């Protein structure tokens, strides 16, 4: 696992976008694993800008999102399909038929199996983008999720439900279930990039990077991946014991390669 400490949330997003663009320049038909939530929004804004400047194309790209609420139709304003259309897809040249998000209105077991098959048929995911929950969840893999789990239905924790309640009005019934890629599915990606910003994520970042690998902290499974990149801002990195070492590695990488990444 490689840790990059950025000066600000904006720098986290910019560095993350640069990784995506380098991949697409090397492999225009890459398969991207995408995430929702507040952290990726700034990343997607950078990708949109770079697309508008003609630096990158998504015309051959295929995408697979991590998760979707069960019981919410794609056209619902709080569905992750709606989120992705608003925050990314409507502003780039990706083909609609190449964007994949679990169907929250289908049979969860059948949909989960079909989603795994679609990923396999696409040749697997080249770069999986992740955010990080305050309790260490990635996707909707809550604490105690199996580290070898595949795409399936999951019951959300009360903490996750509270965290997401701000997106739903008082008269809306908030989903308590979701279809999510499993941790094993995520670890199958050839590269993984996790972004986190803010002091509220500091405990989760420390447990992910420096804690034991444990189902109680699902993101800690990334320690087992041969090509996992963690990009965090100074607040999210504030509780890392080896923060000086991570900064030293950054400076040495810059000295030798001429760039952090």
From Swiss-Prot:
Gene3D superfamilies: 3.40.50.1360. Belongs to the glucosamine/galactosamine-6-phosphate isomerase family. NagB subfamily. Pathway: Amino-sugar metabolism; N-acetylneuraminate degradation; D-fructose 6-phosphate from N-acetylneuraminate: step 5/5. Homohexamer. The gene is nagB. Keywords: Carbohydrate metabolism, Hydrolase. It comes from Hahella chejuensis (strain KCTC 2396). InterPro entries: Glc/Gal-6P_isomerase, Glucosamine6P_isomerase, Glucosamine6P_isomerase_CS, NagB/RpiA_transferase-like. This is Glucosamine-6-phosphate deaminase.
């Amino acid at each position: 696992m490689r840790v990059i400490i950025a000066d600000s949330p904006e720098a986290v997003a910019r560095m993350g976008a640069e990784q995506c663009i380098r991949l697409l320049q090397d492999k225009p038909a890459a398969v991207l694993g995408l995430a929702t939530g507040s952290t990726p929004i700034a990343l997607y804004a950078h990708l949109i800008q770079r697309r508008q400047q003609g630096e990158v194309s998504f015309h051959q790209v295929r995408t697979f999102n991590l998760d979707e609420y069960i019981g919410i139709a794609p056209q619902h304003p709080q569905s992750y399909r709606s989120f992705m259309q608003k925050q990314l897809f409507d502003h780039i040249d990706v083909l609609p038929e190449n964007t994949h998000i679990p169907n929250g209105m289908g049979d969860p077991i059948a949909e989960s199996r079909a989603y795994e098959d679609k990923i396999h048929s696409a040749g697997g995911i080249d770069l999986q983008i992740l955010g990080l929950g305050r309790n260490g969840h990635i996707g909707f893999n809550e604490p105690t999720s199996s580290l070898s789990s595949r795409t399936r239905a999951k019951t959300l924790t009360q903490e996750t439900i509270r965290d997401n309640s701000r997106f739903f009005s008082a008269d809306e019934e908030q989903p308590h279930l979701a279809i999510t890629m499993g941790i094993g599915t995520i670890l199958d990606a050839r590269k993984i990039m996790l972004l986190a910003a803010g002091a509220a994520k500091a405990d989760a970042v420390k447990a992910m990077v420096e804690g034991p690998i444990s189902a109680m902290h699902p993101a800690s499974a990334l320690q087992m991946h041969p090509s996992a990149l963690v990009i965090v801002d100074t607040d999210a990195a504030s509780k890392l014991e080896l923060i000086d070492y991570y900064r030293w590695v950054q400076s040495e990488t810059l000295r030798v390669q001429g760039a952090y990444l």
